[in-house]
Amino acid sequence: MNNSINIASSAMLVELSIRSWTARKLDKRVSSEVDTAKGTKTRVINANKNLLAGTGVLDTIVKYAANARAWHNAQTLPWSDNGSRLLPVSNFVNYKEQLNVLEKNYNALVTKFLTAYPDLVSAAAFQLGDLFDRSEYPDASKIATKFSFNYSFFPVPTAGNFIIEIGRAHV
């Protein structure tokens, strides 16, 4: 009698992808000015500016996404380098319920950010001073495409996977 655990029936694979807009922009003019002022070779310095410096609203989304990823990693086990992680079937219902809450809250934060975005751009003009360039601020509808909260579930392969095959060899 074979009492070995069948990983394909006791676990599944899950992939989680959370994207957020960085609101960072390379300022080539400032980079060049610093290179010239410091006597460096061309393109030694890259000056990146935070387009929404001082607002903190986007930081809240980025931190929330990081916490969601950390929670996901705590609930799952590493499986592959492409982002797939192993989720025990026994944890699926709780995992999915919490994931739905995380997604709902993330989307609410994004909606709040997009609603405030025009005011945040106006505030950035004061924060950035001479570095402010209105053309670097896309329309809110374009910014909305920079945010996403996606996940997929897949069965654990039953053959053709090194981990599965090595397990069979030692049974």
Regions found by a protein language model. Give the residues of each.
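Leu/Val/Ala/Ile-rich N-terminal alpha-helices, chiefly Sec-type signal peptides and the beginnings
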Residues: 1-139
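Conserved small/polar residues in nucleotide/adenosyl-binding loops
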Residues: 169-171
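Acidic, low-complexity proline/glycine-rich segments
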Residues: 138-164
